[in-house]
Curated annotation (Swiss-Prot):
Record bears the keyword Cell membrane: no
The species this protein was found in: Latilactobacillus sakei subsp. sakei (strain 23K)
Subunit structure: Heterooligomer composed of large and small subunits.
The UniProt record lists the keyword Hydrolase: yes
Cystine pairs: none
Protein name, UniProt field: Exodeoxyribonuclease 7 small subunit
Gene3D superfamilies: Exonuclease VII, small subunit (1.10.287.1040)
Similarity section: Belongs to the XseB family.
E.C. number(s) listed in UniProt: 3.1.11.6
Length: 76
């Protein structure tokens, strides 16, 4: 059975749970390492999602069909 693709919000919530768990310091080392690895994967997934959203917004906001970076106003 195919694994359901989680939404950005679901991934973020999972990452927050992992961070809170690790911050307590009450986690055995092996579990902490596994949780840390999962947190890194989630972080990378979230970064990719945000990057893709930024690219999409840049295309939507472009004038004359040219892609404009979201920070174009800051550069001018």
């Amino acid at each position: 059975m195919a694994e359901k693709k989680l939404t950005f919000e679901e991934n973020l919530a999972q990452l927050e749970v992992i961070v809170n768990e690790l911050e307590t310091g009450d986690v055995p080392l092996e579990k902490a390492m596994t949780a840390f690895q999962e947190g890194v994967k989630l972080s990378q997934t979230l970064e990719e999602t945000l990057s893709q959203a930024e690219k999409t917004m840049a295309k939507v906001m472009a004038d004359n069909g040219e892609e404009v970076p979201l920070d174009a106003e800051e550069q001018q």
